[in-house]
């Protein structure tokens, strides 16, 4: 596929001129470490960047974390986006997020890990695996962490989901939140006004839904 065109006013970057030189760990905790990366930029100058790294990294080409995007479908009810509410010490606040987590060695693939996280955090069982993203950056400014997004369908009328049960690990606390698909953006804004911090991926998803609906309305 041909690359997307670059507008005439934009600088063009030569990928060959940017090179990673070395990594040096300068601090290490139980789950995260801080490293100093040396790299060469387009001018040929050597620069330093501080990067947070995950201590547990996958040995394969899989991402080090996954994020499930579940849509709950039930007879005679609105389709709902399934999120989890939890307290995040780093934010000093409660957040609204997609079911997500680190890929464990026993998972094997991102899809298996995403379905396991969905089931443990929400109690729901996936009834339709839709799409898996390529490797994406979690926060490319500050960390080397990567994630894959896995979109899934949950049949709420399935017996397993009628009897859904969360499976918490030690120190884990999740509350399931179901938001009608026709009102996601407004509901997230309401949660934000109430002091919740919405994960940027969730909000970007909601914006995409809203923009898609507006563009579709203009064409009709």
Regions found by a protein language model. Name each.
Residues 125-133:
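A short coil-to-beta-strand element that immediately follows conserved catalytic motifs
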Residues 2-3, 61-71, 76-116, 134-137, ...:
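Conserved Nudix-box catalytic region and its N-terminal flanking loop in Nudix hydrolases
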Residues 2-7, 11-20, 94, 143, ...:
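Nudix hydrolase/Nudix homology domain
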Residues 1-44:
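N-terminal presequences and immediately downstream first alpha-helices
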